[in-house]
């Protein structure tokens, strides 16, 4: 077990705080999450289930070659975040802020227990006549960890070790972060423990939109994100800036988004629609959900301000458009290619 941290303006300090209250854990369980240890969680992805029962797949399979049925969707920080984003589909009204759990579970424990939790959630599909036996057996042995799901995963202070534990087991890894913990990325760079693909979710083109859409719980969130984007530039791993676009809220100023993207110069940019699902329905309306055509038009406007980038692909079921840097090999794998090297 490890000590805890609490994020503070400009630095991270140690501070005592109780573990996740049982009423919060029970709310997650009702939403079909498996609680892992003191502060982590696992949930079967919508597209994993669709892949097993219908042969459909997530846009990440089309864009990057990640097999949806072999993806483990987890988070080491289930109920803690630095933002209160209006579009979040998680039950963030019960989130516990930025005062984090004590003590921390070890990375090895989290990885092993997350795999067990995934299998517990999968077992009901074993006898399903719609599920191919071979595909189920592959799903039983996940090979890709999507470290996102809920909360802000980079608040976990041993993220580099967590990534390393997954890699030891032959996993590829994605981390999806809101970019407010740049010191964690600095540590991972120094330790040479980067994920296979690092996402930062940028959901505002300027600080005014950031304050109204992301509703930060820390006073220097925007400055932290700017630092994170600078750190991403030229990282020796795959990098993505994801724009979650909410009609009537943050779907404006493509030229300002472009300036932020060029700070990081990622391999990929994903322009993706907000989806009217989960708890976000308590805060927004279906009119806030862009159509795929809306996303396509925004991506076309955005790429005009992104020299060295082009629209590479799109996936209408997920309402997402992939923008790619011109020097990325469209048929290649690894850190210089479009596809993940397994």
Swiss-Prot record:
Annotated binding of [4Fe-4S] cluster 1, by residue: 45, 58, 71
All residue ranges annotated as the Radical SAM core domain in the record: 64-312
Name of this chain's protein: S-adenosyl-L-methionine-dependent tRNA 4-demethylwyosine synthase
General function of this protein: Component of the wyosine derivatives biosynthesis pathway that catalyzes the condensation of N-methylguanine with 2 carbon atoms from pyruvate to form the tricyclic 4-demethylwyosine (imG-14) on guanosine-37 of tRNA(Phe).
CDD domains: Radical_SAM (cd01335)
HAMAP family from the UniProt entry: TYW1_archaea
Entry cofactors: [4Fe-4S] cluster
Lineage: Archaea, Methanobacteriati, Methanobacteriota, Thermococci, Thermococcales
EC class: lyase
Positions bound to [4Fe-4S] cluster 2: 81, 85, 88
